[in-house]
Design a protein with these regions (language model features):
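Non-catalytic alpha-helical scaffolds and adjoining flexible linkers that form interface surfaces
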Residues: 1-20, 25-199
Length: 199
């Protein structure tokens, strides 16, 4: 099975000395895992930052086994925020949420678009407020249409950090009690780290 697509890097883990297993959310195929040979080399690893947009060629001899990615960089979003700890942590947290909450090999145009929108939100002055609604929109796309928006809107009319943190906590509590725990999923550490960068 061979195909080409474009997608956002959700995660990467070392496979062996020279290779990585990467997980991407692609435009046409949804969430896909594959091995990147040479993924630890200086040439490639610099643009294998979580959140970056990549062109990918996928090759697999057997549908039941993990395939191989050949990748090229399309947009290096993440390096723009190397000097902004909060936004960098936000990207990692958002990509991890998508990794945890989406099913393998199920395309979803709305998820793909919402990932693209994340990088537009990060350019805004009130990015944190908009990010809270980004998380709500993500949950809504995944079938969790919460009336939580009513509470969050009231909570964050004032653009101060305390109320924004309360908004994030409210969404996090819902995520934990309604989605993660019933499915035996752990609360993502990356989201806790993101919240800690804001305090």
């Amino acid at each position: 099975m061979n195909w080409s697509d474009e997608g956002f890097l959700l995660s990467k883990t070392r496979f062996n000395e020279n290779s990585l297993i990467a997980e991407l959310f692609t435009k046409d195929k949804g969430k896909i895992s594959g091995i990147i040979f040479g993924g630890t080399s200086k040439k490639i690893k610099n643009y294998l930052q979580v959140g970056n947009k990549l062109h990918v060629n996928y090759n697999s001899k057997n549908e039941n086994r993990i395939g191989y990615f050949k990748i090229e960089i399309l947009n290096a979003y993440t390096p723009l925020y190397f000097d902004h700890k909060q936004k960098l942590s936000c990207i990692t947290s958002a990509m991890n949420l998508i990794k945890i909450l989406t099913a393998e090999s199920q395309s979803n145009d709305k998820i793909y678009l919402i990932i693209q929108n994340l990088f537009l939100i990060l350019k805004e002055k009130d990015w944190l407020k908009k990010y809270i609604f980004w998380e709500l929109e993500l949950l809504k796309i995944l079938g969790y249409d919460l009336a939580l928006e009513n509470f969050v809107e009231k909570d964050i009319e004032v653009n101060d950090l305390g109320t924004l943190l309360n908004g994030l906590k409210l969404v996090g509590d819902y995520l934990d009690k309604t989605i993660l725990r019933p499915n035996n999923l752990n609360y993502p550490n990356s989201r806790l780290l993101f919240l800690n960068t804001l305090k």
